[in-house]
Amino acid sequence: MDIKGTTRVCGLIGNPVGHSVSPAIHNNLARLTGKDMVYTTFKVEKGDVASAVRGAYSLNILGLNVTVPHKSEVIDSLVDIDPLAKAIGAVNTLVRTDKGYKGYNTDICLLYTSPSPRD
């Protein structure tokens, strides 16, 4: 993996994150598709979410996934939130916009697309 000044950065915030396989998955997908992107984990303590999100935006991080225990706490750090994520009260995906991050919940999508026990 060749990381340059033009390499886009994405990552996962949470605690713990050391066990996550997300970097391996996303970095392999980036390599296979020829994307100049790197995905890494960021251990963020409870109470530090807002400063982590501000820092990520300042560092031009393209997007973040959010895992436990920060899926609710991160909402206060967003400039916009998808209506479904707002209704659920939990966000697991942050997408960079011109003014900050917009939050989404993609976990709920799995409930609607997963096969039922009878399928």
Regions found by a protein language model. Give the residues of each.
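Phosphate/diphosphate ligand-binding glycine-rich loop within oxidoreductases
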Residues: I3-L110
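Conserved small/polar residues in nucleotide/adenosyl-binding loops
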Residues: Y112-D119
